[in-house]
A protein has these predicted regions:
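Sec-dependent signal peptide recognition
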Residues: 2-10
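Short, linear, compositionally biased motifs with a strong N-terminal bias
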Residues: 10-11, 66
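Subset of outer-membrane beta-barrel
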Residues: 20-314
Length: 314
């Protein structure tokens, strides 16, 4: 039992550093999956694109994804930690779309130590989530969506389970290319804890909009996230982004996440600096059946992250 306690303490310390969170479990669910979303600041829920990865951010948006699209994703994170995901989206009648998705986070191998820092061995940790989604066009302008997700986490010989639901709503005015969305992510909780103490899953209430300037290649987006948590200033809820749409097939994107920049500030001899954390960049190529998106950002002061999305319509 003593060995198990120190195992858990060691892991929790590591994972809190990785996730930049201290109040919830399964914080890998907060990481962006879409490279396009990552490039726009990491929290976008309102872009209207034929992009299957949007299933992970707002289920209401998959109505615009091509029928029978398969999607594979990979993200580099901190050293030793990697994450991968996949999705499949299919039309269901004239107004409906369904999809399935999965996420996998591998934290690598970590040291198991005692209270006096004696190494007792090594252990691994990983998180897995599988989900089913459904979106329906409520009218020509409104779409709604729901995702039901099963989550499991393994730490050495210990594991936990949880269930969560995402609810999404989108309003899209095609003639002015204005999109407004609201999402409630991770409504639910643990059904099996590591030990006897149950933890919360990362509930996140978000609202956002995207607007393309008429007769212009520029589209701007703004998203307010974690509106259920007001423990920090209103500005830190905001992420902003802009797309430069060079053609119907090519775009470049950039964004800024104010919360991430604030959380990752560190002090040195020259003062405080976030070392470019908060800034994100990306781009994509969208052909008739093949799509490639790449996004770059920093989610930890010690490492850069690269997200690659590949989608193919069967």
């Amino acid at each position: 039992m003593k060995r198990a306690v120190f195992t858990i303490i060691s892991l929790i310390s590591t994972l809190l550093t990785v996730a930049q969170e201290s109040q919830t479990a399964y914080n890998f669910l907060r990481l962006p999956v879409s490279a396009h979303v990552a490039a726009l600041g990491g929290d976008n829920i309102s872009i209207i694109e034929d992009d299957a990865t949007l299933i992970f951010h707002n289920p209401a948006l998959i109505n615009d994804v091509s029928d029978r699209t398969i999607n594979l994703n990979y993200m580099t994170y901190m050293e030793g930690a990697k994450t991968a995901s996949a999705a499949f989206v299919k039309a269901a009648g004239e107004r409906g779309t369904w999809g399935v998705s999965a996420q996998y986070m591998d934290y690598g191998t970590m040291k198991e130590v005692s209270w006096d820092n004696t190494q007792l061995g090594e252990f691994s940790a990983r998180d897995i989530a599988v989900a089913g989604s459904y979106a329906y066009a409520l009218s020509n302008r409104f779409s709604g969506g729901i995702t039901a997700r099963f989550i499991t986490s393994h730490i050495a010989s210990y594991h936990s389970m949880a269930v969560g639901i995402d609810l999404g709503l989108n309003y899209y005015l095609e003639e002015s290319e204005l999109s407004i969305s609201a999402v409630a992510k991770n409504l639910g909780g643990q059904i099996k804890a590591y030990d006897d103490e149950f933890e919360r899953i990362p509930l996140d209430l978000q609202v956002g909009f995207s607007k393309r300037l008429l007769n212009s290649p520029l589209r701007f987006s703004a998203t307010m996230s974690r509106l259920n948590d007001w423990s920090y200033g209103i500005g830190k809820h905001l992420s902003v982004g802009a797309d430069l749409i060079l053609s119907p097939t090519i775009y470049l994107a950039a964004g800024y996440n104010f919360r991430r920049a604030s959380e990752m500030k560190i002090s040195d001899s020259e003062g405080e600096s976030s070392h470019s954390a908060g800034l994100s960049l990306g781009g994509g190529l969208s052909l008739e059946r093949f799509k490639l998106h790449i996004g770059y950002a920093k989610y930890h002061v010690s490492a850069n992250s690269l997200i690659i999305n590949v989608s193919y319509t069967l």
